[in-house]
Design a protein with these regions (language model features):
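Acidic/histidine-rich, metal-coordinating catalytic segments
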Residues: 18, 36-52, 74, 126-131
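C-terminal domain-tail junction helix/linker
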Residues: 64-66, 88-146
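Short, aromatic/basic amphipathic alpha-helical patches
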Residues: 52-61
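Short, acidic, Ser/Thr-enriched surface-loop or helix-capping motifs
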Residues: 4-5
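RNase H-like polynucleotidyl transferase catalytic core
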Residues: 42-46, 61-81, 98-102
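Residues at alpha-helix caps and immediate loop-helix transition turns in enzyme cores, especially N-
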Residues: 23, 53-54, 81
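Short small-residue beta-strand/loop micro-motif enriched in glycine and branched aliphatics
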Residues: 9-13, 69-71, 95-96
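Active-site beta-loop-alpha junctions of metal-dependent nucleic acid enzymes
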Residues: 12-36
């Protein structure tokens, strides 16, 4: 999963495994969907995110002009926003819904992401949704310098 630090917009998918290749594919998919520039990928120190220049996720970050930052080792609270979203996913989606099969699980995840981004008020955003925050941001007038 990925979350925008500014708007709390959520991107998530069900990956086949925790490998660098799956993480790189998810990043590429997120970049394709995201309407704004991603400056940094902030992650834990897992082997799926960190490695040499030949590492698939490192290469994907570089190809998309995305820098990498990492949490302090054994300190998941340094990535508190992501940890909170994971808890919300587990509380509001995963533990509440009985999935018929893998396809249904994926459909239900997409529905939850839509709900999370467009309907669910966020206390950290003064009860706005990520969609409302992004809409307000992109609707700002562009000022020209004289």
């Amino acid at each position: 999963m990925a979350i925008d630090d500014f708007s709390r917009e959520l991107y998530a998918d069900i990956l086949p495994d925790k490998t660098q290749h799956s993480a790189a594919c998810f990043l590429t998919s997120t970049v394709a969907q995201c309407p704004y520039q991603i400056d940094y990928a902030y992650s834990d120190n897992g082997k799926e995110f960190k490695g040499t220049d030949s590492h698939a996720f490192v290469k994907a970050c570089r190809q998309h002009g995305i820098g990498q930052k990492f949490t302090r080792i054994n300190r998941p609270q340094t990535n508190g926003k992501a940890e909170r979203v994971i808890r919300t996913l587990m509380d509001m989606w995963h533990s509440k819904i009985h999935f018929k099969d893998c396809a249904d699980r994926h459909i239900q995840l997409l529905r939850f992401i839509n709900f999370y981004n467009t309907v669910k008020p966020h206390k950290s955003l003064n009860n706005a949704t990520p969609y409302e925050i992004l809409t307000a941001y992109f609707n700002q007038p562009i000022c020209k310098q004289l």
